[in-house]
Amino acid sequence: MAQWEMLQNLDSPFLDQLHQVYSQSFLPMDFRQHLASWIEDQNWREAALESDDAKANMLYFSILDQLNQWDHYSSDPKSLLLQHNLRKFSRDIQPFPNGPSQLAEMIFNLLLEEQRILIQAQRAQEVQPPPAPEAVVESQQLEIENRIQGLHVDIEFLVRSIRQLKDEQDVFSFRYTVFSLKKTSSSDPHQSQQAHVVQATANKVDRMRKEVLDISKGLVGRLTTLVDLLLPKLDEWKVQQQKSCIGAPPPVKSAAEQLEQWLTAGAKFLFHLRQLLKQLKEMSCLRYQGDMFAKGVDLRNAQVMELLQRLLQRSFVVETQPCMPQTLHRPLILKTGNKFTVRTRLLVRLQEGSESLKAEVSVDRNSDLPGFRKFNILTSNQKTLTPEKGQRQGLIWDFGFLTLVEQRAVGAGKGNNKGPLAVTEELHVISFVVEYTYQGLKMKLQTDTLPVVIISNMNQLSFAWASILWFNMLSPNPKNQQFFCQAPKAPWSLLGPVLSWQFSSYVARGLDSEQLGMLRTKLFGKSCKMEDALLSWVDFCKRESPPGKIPFWTWLDKILELVHDHLKDLWKDGRIMGFVSRNQERRLLKKMLSGTFLLRFSETSEGGITCSWVEHQDDHKVEIYSVQPYTKEVLQSLPLTEIIRHYQVLAEENIPENPLRFLYPRIPRDEAFGCYYQEKVNLEEQEEYLKHKLIVISNRQVDELQQPLELKQDSESLEVNAELLLAHDQELPLMMQTGLVLGTELKVDPILSTAPQVLLEPAPQVLLEPAPQVLLEPAPQVLLEPAPQVLLEPAPQVLLEPAPQVLLEPAPQVQLEPAPQVLLELAPQVLLEPAPQVLLELAPQVQLEPAHLLQQPSESDLPEDLQQISVEDLKKLSNPSTEYITTNENPMLAGESSGDETSIPYHSHFDADGLLGWTLDTF
């Protein structure tokens, strides 16, 4: 930053010192501010302290000449005061007896005072917090803009100086030629006078040549300063781009355009100065004894060419790193045979109007690493940029359809990797070369991409991305292709933000300090208190990480995939706590209200999320329950929000209840997740098929409590196995009323097998074939014996609703809903016995308990609707024809009209398919 710019940013006490210094000086502050860049670039020490006044005289006349150039400011009313002050100062310094030396000493002393004030301010700021990064960036941008504006003035001043030198040199050539032709005798007074004039002209030409060289030297110095300011800005942009490739926020979109504007301005100055130096080179043909003008011009030209080479070479960049369209969130990973895109750009937007620029791409251009695979560009490896396109969009080469193919090794199929590195640890570099031509200058420009990992199978994508993360996080050299031959360890101070970037870039929300703390403990353990603890590459992605047997990166990447595919909205809105250890989970929940729950990622499964809640017992014990983790296979069938909404646990009385009441800390469940619930189904809508939905019910096993593997570390925690059940949209409230027990041991199984035991079709015919024999024993209990026997405890209502709805109650009467056709095929024998149990044995081989045959009920014992059915009607019902069945209308019983058809459910003692735990509803 320029010294004057730094002075302007000082606090008030130091600014007061600066005003006091200039109030006591003859040099006005307006002059100091307006020529700040030029003043700071001159060597005032040499002009003030050395005995030779040549340097002071040159600077003195340069100041006078610049002060005389401010006449164009008179057109601007705002510059009237500035113009007046500068003119006054120009008049005041001319009468000085030793004007050049006094002026040089004055400016030199003022610069020393300014440096003293700056040192005091810097010492005072050492104990204060640094300024905001935004303020620093704005200050740097302002300095660059000011320097560019100052260079415009300096270039114009050099142009005028060269023009004046050329005119004076022409005058000297003319006078010298005339003097040589008329030379007669040295004693001629007229000739002596002419010789004196010629000598004076020669001295003036020599002085002006030195001034021009000094002006060009100062201009080269200021251009060097500008380039030194711009290239770090360009490096910052490249670093931001590199970090954005691994998830960090990308650079501002306008950053590249701003850099292009600055770099183009700097290149224009250099090319203009190069043309001016060519003119000076032509003027150097006039030589005299002791003339150093030609050597000075050659030296300036060499400096300009060096600056141009630096600027152009660094300005050729890869604007968009290589990326496949199907994995935009993970650039720098390429698959053989798949297309990928990459874009290069020359940030110096200068192109000849008739010259096309051609870019050529290659893989591993200058490297021959042993054991590394070799690749070729399958498609065209060249891209041509026409002048018309360059003027319209900039000097951009967009490669959109590149494809890599592996080279075949001699004596083998494809080139196999025999090196020390795995395929996902091989780093390859894609290079671009452009033959740049402008104003007669020809230069070969080259740029490289960040190292890429080339895979042959998408299964390698996860480990390849781990390599990209590790390299771009730690490597100081972007071209180090053998980085993984001895991969360095990563400090947590770098690894933590990178892990957070994976979530912020992919699922729109990063990790907070508590979540990062859990990951840090998982990686380094509780005993490690160092902030910069080091983690090896093997521990990050290869070695198993406790408590599960999964490498850390595999576990984390599966969670990323799960959140992106199924939980993105919940994660973005902060509903998922996510990274919580078991101990931390207990500390959070044990002081909360009963029913408070949180969502965390399982540490023992790949891509699993579980729900844990707290319950306070009557004996003041605190129990923490956790559901078996849900993976993507489960969430593909049922969203997590619907699981939370309809989750049920069977209590001791077999009454289903939802234990999830408050999302941690105290947000009501429906308030937290209501906006994510699926739309309610219109119950009055007639459909061709019976609708169904999946809900989750768990059975709280009080007597036979077994802790699963994940809960063995915590004796006070219980993990309840969950099962997906198939039910009608109307079923859930009815289930909660009936208290139906679906099973004693339920498992999470996303594949709902229909089995041959229950048939549910939209037809009006219901076939119920439980076993060779069915024993109906009216009793307060219903026992289902699939494989491990399922016991249904007394409940006021047991509902089995096929298509036409059949209701049997444990009363002496059996009511059958009016329906045109109901086929109930029980078995070859139907035994009715007043016993306390109803046993449905659905297995292929069923052994029936002893039972007594009962008398068939008399007609008076039957319901009124059944008494009206004759034997012929029953035969028709047992063999219905297609004309009795329509899309939205059921066959009618005797005495029933079409308007009597309702959707009122009737309760039945029949139950089926206890093995699956299905509950059937019908309209």
UniProtKB/Swiss-Prot annotation:
Location of region: Mediates interaction with USP18: 137-571
GO BP annotations, alphabetical order: defense response to virus; negative regulation of type I interferon-mediated signaling pathway; regulation of mitochondrial fission; regulation of protein phosphorylation; type I interferon-mediated signaling pathway
Tissues expressed in: Found in the brain, lung, heart, spleen, liver, kidney, muscle and the testis.
Record-listed Phosphoserine modification sites: 284
GO terms of molecular function: DNA binding; DNA-binding transcription factor activity
Disulfide bonds: none
InterPro entries linked: p53-like_TF_DNA-bd_sf, SH2, SH2_dom_sf, STAT, STAT2_C, STAT2_SH2, STAT_linker, STAT_N_sf
Keywords annotated in UniProt: Activator, Cytoplasm, DNA-binding, Nucleus, Phosphoprotein, SH2 domain, Transcription, Transcription regulation, Ubl conjugation
Post-translational modification: Tyrosine phosphorylated in response to IFN-alpha. 'Lys-48'-linked ubiquitination by DCST1 leads to STAT2 proteasomal degradation.
Domain SH2 residues, every copy: 571-666
Record localization: Cytoplasm; Nucleus
GO cellular component terms, A-Z: cytoplasm; nucleus
The family this protein is said to belong to: Belongs to the transcription factor STAT family.
Subunit organization: Heterodimer with STAT1 upon IFN-alpha/beta induced phosphorylation. The heterodimer STAT1:STAT2 forms the interferon-stimulated gene factor 3 complex (ISGF3) with IRF9; interacts with IRF9 in the cytoplasm. Interacts with CRSP2 and CRSP6. Can form a homodimer upon IFN-alpha induced phosphorylation. Interacts with IFNAR1 and IFNAR2; the interaction is direct. Interacts with ARL2BP. Interacts with E3 ubiquitin ligase DCST1; the interaction results in STAT2 ubiquitin-mediated proteasomal degradation. Interacts with USP18; the interaction is direct and allows the recruitment of USP18 to IFNAR2.
Function comment: Signal transducer and activator of transcription that mediates signaling by type I interferons (IFN-alpha and IFN-beta). Following type I IFN binding to cell surface receptors, Jak kinases (TYK2 and JAK1) are activated, leading to tyrosine phosphorylation of STAT1 and STAT2. The phosphorylated STATs dimerize, associate with IRF9/ISGF3G to form a complex termed ISGF3 transcription factor, that enters the nucleus. ISGF3 binds to the IFN stimulated response element (ISRE) to activate the transcription of interferon stimulated genes, which drive the cell in an antiviral state.
Protein name: Signal transducer and activator of transcription 2
